[in-house]
């Protein structure tokens, strides 16, 4: 098969992440606007006014744009749902990602392409056949193993199950990122404890906290493996992507709309490279080891295989927050870029920066640019280190803009089990 037969879908929660996804080689991006998406109140979101700009940027770079409209929708939400889908249609959004039949039906009625959300928990071919009348792409339940995915794929081909476009239904699966302890994300813990519904895009992620389990009758604290008994490790499938492709997965969805642009670029690049390696027949252990090492540098809670390989049940994180091998520390803001000589000027606002440091520069147009500092100049003179208050210049491989943020990447010691 060819690269064009597969799709890497990157998460976008900001213009910085949008540009980072493009830099990473994404084939498509998915995002939300205010209301009716599963990150509507738990992360940054765009507005309806951003739709045309996002679609235009995607069009300029030849990638598809998918808008999430996948929360539980109540009667009072129907006017807003129609308004959002109308705006998506008018702006030229490639497809909406929906979980409610009301949204699917309305989108179909106005000619807006639909993809099915994992919230539907589609676990068998009969359910897929029912929903095929609405959608051309389906995200199967995250709890399936690859044998079950392959059986559904075989039935799609055998029965010629097609969507509204008249083409065979394409299978999409989550490939990387955060996992929820609940089946297909249908969790009520946040609503119960914080009056903020995960099914309405307002998850407070209290499952990520440390807990102890107490037996009220005996007053004995139960022995559990670690305190983070409801916080799963992150999904990582890059080491068996070849098996996912062979099983019939065609769209690889990367989770992370609430994560930074450097994460988006890193993860997108690695999975895009994996697709290319598979198609060129060079997918091997050496490359897998390289991708693994790079991915450990991005935000993660430790990694496991999900349910795909059917080898074991959930694995739980052993700490709060990220287990990344590197962290970013803000040090400077962008001033000017001299395109003729490929030099960027910054002003130090915190800490220090030395020759040999790894840096990350982010911005709404710049995206996420990472490199090593080869030389620093202050007042045109080379120095080994620059500190707060100084203006300095460095060679940059890509253009930066005024007010871009420069971070120094620092190594982090992590617990062995997170690896």
Which residues are covered by each model-predicted region?
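Charged helix-capping and loop-helix junction motifs
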Residues: 44-50, 79-84
């Amino acid at each position: 098969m060819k690269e064009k037969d597969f799709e890497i879908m990157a998460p976008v929660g900001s213009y910085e992440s949008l540009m980072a996804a493009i830099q990473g080689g994404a084939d498509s991006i998915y995002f939300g606007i205010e209301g009716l998406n599963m990150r509507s109140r738990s992360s940054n979101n765009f507005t309806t006014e951003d739709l045309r700009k996002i679609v235009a940027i995607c069009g300029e770079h030849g990638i598809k744009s998918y808008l999430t409209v996948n929360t539980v929708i109540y009667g009072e939400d129907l006017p807003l749902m129609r308004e959002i889908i109308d705006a998506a249609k008018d702006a030229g959004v490639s497809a909406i990602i929906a979980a409610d039949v009301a949204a699917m039906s309305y989108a179909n009625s106005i000619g807006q392409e639909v993809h099915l959300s994992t919230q539907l928990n589609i676990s068998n071919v009969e359910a897929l056949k029912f929903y095929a009348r609405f959608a051309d792409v389906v995200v199967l339940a995250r709890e399936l193993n690859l044998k079950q995915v392959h059986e559904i794929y075989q039935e799609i081909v055998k029965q010629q199950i097609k969507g509204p476009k008249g083409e065979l239904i394409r299978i999409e699966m989550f490939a990387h990122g955060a996992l929820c302890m609940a089946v297909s994300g249908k969790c009520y813990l946040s609503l119960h404890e914080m009056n903020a519904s995960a099914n309405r895009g307002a998850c407070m992620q209290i499952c990520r906290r440390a807990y102890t389990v107490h037996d009220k009758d005996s007053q004995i604290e139960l022995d559990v493996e670690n305190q983070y008994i409801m916080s799963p490790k992150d999904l990582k499938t890059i080491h068996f992507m070849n098996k996912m492709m062979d099983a019939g997965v065609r769209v690889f969805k990367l989770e992370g709309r609430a994560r930074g642009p450097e994460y988006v670029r890193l993860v997108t690049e690695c999975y895009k490279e994996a697709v290319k390696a598979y198609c060129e027949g060079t997918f091997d252990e050496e490359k897998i080891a390289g991708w693994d090492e790079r991915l450990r540098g991005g935000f993660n809670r430790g990694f496991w295989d999900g349910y795909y390989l059917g080898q074991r049940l959930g694995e739980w994180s052993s700490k709060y927050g990220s287990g990344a091998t590197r962290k970013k520390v803000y040090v400077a803001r962008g001033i000017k870029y001299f395109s003729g000589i490929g030099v960027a000027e910054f002003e130090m606002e915190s800490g220090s920066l030395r020759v040999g440091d790894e840096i990350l520069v982010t911005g709404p147009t710049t995206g996420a640019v990472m490199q090593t500092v080869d030389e620093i100049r202050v007042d045109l003179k080379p120095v080994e280190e620059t500190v707060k208050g100084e203006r300095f210049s460095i060679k940059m491989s890509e253009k930066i803009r005024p007010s871009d943020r420069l971070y120094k990447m620092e190594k982090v010691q992590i617990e062995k089990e997170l690896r």
